[in-house]
Amino acid sequence: MLNLKVIYFGTPQFAATVLEDLLHHDVNVIGVVTRVDKPQKRSSQPIPSPVKTLALSKNIPLLQPEKASDPQFIEQLKAFEADVFIVVAYGAILRQVVLNIPKYGCYNLHAGLLPAYRGAAPIQRCIMDGVTQSGNTVIRMDAGMDTGDIAGVSYVPVGPDMTAGELAEALSAQGGEILIKTLQQISDGTISHTPQDSSKASIAPKLSKEEGFVLWNHPAEKVYAQIRGVTPAPGAWTLYSYQDKPAKRLVIRKASLASNKGIYGNPGDVIVSDQQELLIACAEGAICLKEIQPEGKGAMDSKTFLNGHSNHKLKLSFQNN
């Protein structure tokens, strides 16, 4: 077990997966900080974060400040006399007064290859950009947004059909290992830090729901990258109309590139293959919709959707932006 006393900051499942790995390897986590409970989706009841649930199950002291700058919270942190703070997808900015508390500083696990994709959505943005390699970067935090010196990097390939959710799982599964290595280097005095090359920096801001609206007037490869990048959240969607009725929202849960590249049609046109596949024409090529969710209904495969729309070849059309 490492002798370092660690306080862990994190909130979503990504952070819970990493924390569980640290605990499995006997990292001395003496306290956990997570965001306050918030209602999720249709539930009006506050729901604890995955990190909170894990911390409580392990009987680890837990803090949930409304603001990380709260003076009482800062005094509580100081009372732990921690050696290191580890921050993984906490979800709030930590000011310098907090970063100065631990003996050896604060280290952040960033789910991207810094200095590229600084910000809240490195996983989604890199897939939307069509990159083939991502990874985790550990930085010693400073007051900037993901601008700290690099202490470690690990790499994860991005498969051609990988969604943001799948990449997040791969990165979180690897995150504990690189953090344990970092903590060991801090403990034995071999840690080194490399300044980021800011000339190579890019920003990855949080995605809006509107960015899930599929733009069919791009080549199919770019459309597919967009769909994968916003899956599962904020989610890919389009609008469709049927028999001159008002347009409705259609959520795209699973899709693929159409295997037949010789597909022609205006962007947004519906094409039904001989195998009863639901294809949507793009500027070049087409997207095959595998699993969808029409507005007001549950998720279904494309064949079920087509069976409910007679004369679909003539009267079903997807709106294009």
UniProtKB/Swiss-Prot annotation:
One of its GO terms (cellular component) is cytosol. It comes from the Bacteria. Disulfide bonds: none annotated. InterPro entries: Fmt, Formyl_trans_C, Formyl_transf_N, Formyl_transf_N_sf, Formyl_transferase-like_C_sf, GART_AS, Met-tRNA-FMT_C, Met-tRNA-FMT_N. It catalyses: L-methionyl-tRNA(fMet) + (6R)-10-formyltetrahydrofolate = N-formyl-L-methionyl-tRNA(fMet) + (6S)-5,6,7,8-tetrahydrofolate + H(+). The keyword Phosphoprotein does not apply. Pfam families: Formyl_trans_C, Formyl_trans_N. Its EC number is 2.1.2.9. (6S)-5,6,7,8-tetrahydrofolate binds at residues 112-115. GO terms for molecular function: methionyl-tRNA formyltransferase activity. Keywords: Protein biosynthesis, Transferase. Belongs to the Fmt family. Attaches a formyl group to the free amino group of methionyl-tRNA(fMet). The formyl group appears to play a dual role in the initiator identity of N-formylmethionyl-tRNA by promoting its recognition by IF2 and preventing the misappropriation of this tRNA by the elongation apparatus. This is Methionyl-tRNA formyltransferase. It comes from Chlamydia caviae (strain ATCC VR-813 / DSM 19441 / 03DC25 / GPIC) (Chlamydophila caviae).
